[in-house]
Amino acid sequence: MNGSVRTDKTTWGELPHKFEAGTAPMAEAVGLGAAIDYLEAIGLENIAAHEHELTEYALGKLSEIPGMTLYGPPADRRAGIVSFNLEGVHPHDVAQILDLSGVAIRAGHHCCQPLMQKLGVAATNRASFYLYTIPEEIDQLVEGLYAVRKVFA
């Protein structure tokens, strides 16, 4: 914060206030409190269990798709994220076609180029699951991936 501002001179507030610009984020703090209350009411262990079930389900379904490469550890050692590639199809093409059917995933190097180099790929697809994801949405992802295979067959 500043102490005073004039056209010819500005003075700064005392420490630590001179490093805090603008209005304090009060609405954001209240929103964060509400989000914490919401998550605590559900229970973090319940959220983790749901995520694990979804990840296990997704890995099972995705592993049945011909030409599918899955990256990462088994379901019991990962969060609700699955990275994959579909043989012969660039990840951006996969993401674009899935988007047309209402399925949103990420495609690219995900800010981890050293890992992509280690895996020997330029990019991957990444699907994420959380509290609000339901198994039917994973089914929609899988159906979309079969459609991608048809386009590039």
Predicted segment positions?
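Pyridoxal 5′-phosphate
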Residues: 1-153
